Amino acid sequence: MSARPDQSRTAAPSATTSPVEIYCDGACSGNPGPGGYGAILRYNGHEKEIRGSEAHTTNNRMELTAAMEALRLLTRPCRITIVTDSQYLVKGMTEWIQGWQRRGWQNSKKEPVLNRDLWEELLKLSAHHDVSWQWIRGHAGHAENERCDSLARQAITEMRGAP
């Protein structure tokens, strides 16, 4: 594994608006268990933070959900860079998904693809945009990634009703 961030693009229509930066992260307390996600969207000097949770989920589902919920907030086609510490998300969208689709949503071991519902939704949401997927190392001092992790954990705490 390289310490250099991976940068990959998914094919999408050309976008005509200013670039959007999305930082996202998912977290789980137990895996599976209660989970949360957090995301930061930046556009034209504006910033929006979002977070959410599910009572019983996995870390990977929260990673995918973070990206999905951020994409849902965009109202027109955009150039987007999505930055995440999830290789599962980046490789899924840039390397694996075409093969899964060709094989009828089976992985290379001929098993059903996990989280297919979320992958299909991510494909649908990203199809309207020009998306670049960037991996960064988690818990390595990247301010936005740390903030997204904090938002995800805060969402879990709020769901549990803790102060």
Curated annotation (Swiss-Prot):
Keywords, in A-Z order: Cytoplasm, Endonuclease, Hydrolase, Magnesium, Metal-binding, Nuclease
Bound cofactor: record note: Binds 1 Mg(2+) ion per subunit. May bind a second metal ion at a regulatory site, or after substrate binding.
Keyword Lipid biosynthesis: no
Chain positions recorded as Mg(2+) 1 binding sites: 25, 63, 85
SUPFAM superfamilies: Ribonuclease H-like (SSF53098)
Catalyzed reactions per annotation: Endonucleolytic cleavage to 5'-phosphomonoester
Binding residue positions for Mg(2+) 2: 25, 149
GO biological process: DNA replication, removal of RNA primer
Domain (RNase H type-1): residue spans on this chain: 16-157
EC nos: 3.1.26.4
One Pfam family linked to the record: RNase_H
Keyword Nuclease: yes
Subunit annotation: Monomer.
Family in the record: Belongs to the RNase H family.
Function description: Endonuclease that specifically degrades the RNA of RNA-DNA hybrids.
NCBIfam families in the cross-refs: PRK00203.1
PANTHER family: RIBONUCLEASE H1 (PTHR10642:SF26)
Name the record gives this protein: Ribonuclease H
Organism whose genome encodes this protein: Pelobacter propionicus (strain DSM 2379 / NBRC 103807 / OttBd1)
